[in-house]
Structures are given as structure tokens and as C-alpha cells.
Amino acid sequence: MATLNGTSNGHGKMLSLTLQIWRQKNSKTKGRMEEYKIKGVSTEMSFLEMLDMLNEQLIKEGKDPVAFDHDCREGICGMCGAMVNGYAHGPDEATTLCQTHMRSFSDGDTITIEPWRAKAFPVIKDLAVDRTSFERIIQSGGYISVGTGGTPDANAIPIPKEAADRAMDAAQCIGCGACVAACPNASAMLFTSAKISHLANLPQGQVERHLRAANMIRAMDELGFGNCTNHGECEAVCPKEIKMENIALMNREYFGAMM
């Protein structure tokens, strides 16, 4: 039987929490913080499972459940994301919101949950935001359109180990938007640079490298993202630990394109 108020039932410690959650009908309406009490939250639950539990409670009370983005819940897809007590994805480093567990919190805690805050990420509802601006950046050039041969040819092209490692590290970006949410300028330069760096380090990406950088940076600016001023907040909250050195590479690519 479940036990409350910090005791254990054999399935992790049970928590009683106060949740301060941003509620907003859509991007055109004013939002507000609403407070909810929730009991019997196991420390073995993920953060999203805790929100599921809250929504079950709200539905039983005849109230509107909290809208939030999610999909794989395995830290892979990049769909989930929210500001938790002022931190993108929560208190744990290199962790997505869905992989954050309630053992990171204590009984009696008050947890403040807000959506990503950025002009380019308008609120859809509550904690869910529209991140199609990232897709538009990719559409502007984050791909290879030239012929690169058949599938077997990929294994026949020599790539230096260091270049392959840099490309693989950059390719880990899942497009969650935490970098934008954490940045005081709402800059998307870590995201954009990861996509540019991924392809710039591969031989298949060389033909279009300068055009790619110019087009993706232009799209990023047109979509309303801010510029990078080297605060480093993006790297600090990135769940895949994408490094700011990719931004330096992107700037070099852009300068090359403008010459």
C-alpha cells in the first residue's frame, strides 16, 4: 500500500509536493501561475510520470489537465522540455526532462514549472511550445543535396578519426530547445552550429558547406533568435553536452561564405 509524506513503500520514497505551473490557453492569451498539491509521488517516477499523475488527479476533479510535450521518454527525441525551478530540463546535468527522476527532489518541495521562454517558441498551451522554427533552420540548409554515391560508398570514403568524432558529437543534438530557453538572448546558435558542424566535418558536406552556413544563419536571424554573447548557459544545460566550440566553427564557416 502506498504511503505518503516521505515514507517508503518498497518502491522508492514517497513525496508530497507543491507545484507552481504556468497555465496559458494559447500564445494570444495571458498566462498565469497556478498552484497544485500532489501526494504519493514515488522517487522512482520520472518527472513526466509525475505530471501524468497530476493530470489524472486534475481530470478526476473535472479540471483541465496540464499540456506538455513528450514522445519517446527515453532522452532521444527532444520533444520534452520545460524550465524547472529556473533550470532547463531540471536540476540534473546532461539530462532531458523525461530522464529527470523525482529522487532529485525532496519531500515538501515547491517546484516551479514553466515553458521555454523565447519569441521564436510561441506557447501552444501551458508547457507546450511551437518549435517549428528549428525545422525551418534545418530546411534552409541542414542537409546534403548533392549526390554522394550509394550506401556502400559511405564506407569507402576515408574520414580522419578526429573529424568523425567531431561530426558524431555534433550530430547528437536532439533539437530540444534547452539552449534557447537558457540563453539570456534566446540564441539558437548552439543548435544551428551543431547542425553545421556535423556536416562540415564530413567529406560529403564539403560541396555545400559555405552556402549551408550562410542560409542557416540567415534563417536563424529571420526567425527571431538572438545572437550569442558567450554566456555559456547553452552548453551548461544541453542534455547531449554539445560544446560551444561548434559556434566558433560556425562563425568560421560563415566568414568563409561571406568572402
Q: What are these model-derived regions, one by one?
A:
Residues M14-Y36:
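Eukaryote-biased recognition of intrinsically disordered, low-complexity regulatory segments
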Residues M1-Q20:
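Charged, low-complexity intrinsically disordered regulatory segments in eukaryotic signaling
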